[in-house]
Amino acid sequence: RGIRVILDLAMNHSSSSHPWFQQAAEYLKSLPEGAEPDSSECPYVDYYHFSREYQGGYAQLDGTAWYYEARFWDGMPDLNLENEAVRREFEQIADFWLDMGVDGFRLDAVKEYVTGSTEDNVEILSWFADYVHGKDPENYLVCECWTDQNTYAKYYESGVDSMFDFAFADKSGIIANVMNGKASATSYAKNLETEQGMYAQYNPDYINAPFYTNHDMGRSAGYYAGENSEAQTKMGNALNLLMNGNVFLYYGEELGMKGSGKDENKRAPMYWSKDGNAEGMCKGPADMDDFRMKFDSLEEQQEDPDSIYNYVKQVIRVRNQNPVIARGTTAYLEQYSGEQCFALTRSYEGSNLLLLGNTSAEAVSVDLTGLTVGGTTAEELVLLGELYTGEETAERAGTVVTLPAYSILILGEE
């Protein structure tokens, strides 16, 4: 099917059981009291950050007076990516997988390469991006930098292809806030427009990487409660999938899987079947809580035309049928947007379309008088896609479009 495969690559840290760390630890334990480590005797001692003094984010090396940097957990010591020898190791690792046919990497925890220094982290990413793209410009790099939007925008200067767009993700992100009524519908469209300049100033060739949830976040189905929760879950997925760039979808979001609290719950196994003994089913992480899913399993949702699964399939189909959605530039249409409805255009190489969305529980009418999309008036625009979470459908009367609750309309030139 032409599916490209990328692998998760954690360059920030290794396991404390890794031979590099084990050899460094044994060497430090063997040093006479007061002696300084010598990398000519053990090169691996410079693969990590060791210190005689405790610092925040450091753990004590058992049986010694030494401490080592371990930002996430004492079982995951941080690597010294400013060490050329460590860089050569990761070039060999990249070679191994790229030569095997992998198409790129998701780079984990890039803001912790040198904690607190965006400048140093950008330099490290520049080295790796140059190396990977030097092997093949089509090799793809997307980075996880869980911080504010202004900061992760700066990482585009490194030449990596994509940064995960955290501003729209998680229960406090733009999408969930809009769908919960904590933010206006216009904030979705307006932020899509403004972030383009924010990223392009660092890399004009950037490719956005929208996502809604990941393995460290609560499942999106848990963001909503009440009688409209299924509709909100559906449309939240649509707002993610209709962003431009390379969109990422965490497994199980297309089912409305449940999972929050500790990490094990967020990583519950795919809900293939309600029969726990069915093929493909597994028990999940040992420390995962015992909880029931909010919505049906995949095998049940496949048979239900109104399920979250079939809704998400429809959104993806609309996206794939209209490449301008992924590739185009967004323009926010303030005149035609409001608290409960957004209007935006997406344009790419002479192709243009209009996205209208109602993020509320009530029908909303929008008068598009005066609007032209690529030279086509509102009345002449043709239907390219319609996404409904209920039985009601949109109505068009001249320049007036009435959108039912939690719905999206995609219109374009004939």
Region locations from a protein language model:
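Conserved alpha/beta catalytic core and glycan-binding cleft of carbohydrate-active enzymes
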Residues: 16-17, 22-53, 129-277
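Short glycine/proline-rich turn/loop motifs
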Residues: 67-82, 214-221, 289-299
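Short, acidic/polar
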Residues: 84-98, 233, 237
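Short loop/turn motifs at secondary-structure junctions
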Residues: 101-103, 211, 402
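C-terminal beta-strand-rich structural cap/linker in extracellular carbohydrate-active enzymes
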Residues: 393-414
